Amino acid sequence: MREWTREERYRVLKSADEISGLYEQVQRSIYRQAYHVQPITGLSSDPNGFTLHNGTWHLCYQWCPWGAAHGLKYWYHTTSRDLMHWENEGIGLKPDCYYDNRGTHSGSAICKGDKLYFFYTGNHRDEDWTRTPYTCAAVLGEDGKLNKLEKP
């Protein structure tokens, strides 16, 4: 196998169109699961934020959309009412701010009142590639989307 370059591993996903061909190829795979949570493309790793909130189970996982290589991590969001049938809700958290410019890494979730909060490790790297981790937070909106809180 060939080694992925840093540029390949940390490529930013700008639109769903960029992975549409890869998505179609993955959907046709004879190895595609019919029961378990799995990524729409690429690599999934650490499950995060596994929580029951208002009758719906929420499960996010770290996701690298391009292939089986660790790099720029997103959180992909899935939901279920029965833990058997899962719905893909799309990207939950994108690495798109100063605090997580090189990935949205492991975290958790907690229900407080009627709100569901998600906490994750923002992976920041500077121009010298020095890593600084930040504890970041998001809240589940009424539209079912995760909304980042402004500052860690």
Language-model regions: role of each:
Residues M1-P152:
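Beta-rich carbohydrate-recognition and catalytic domains
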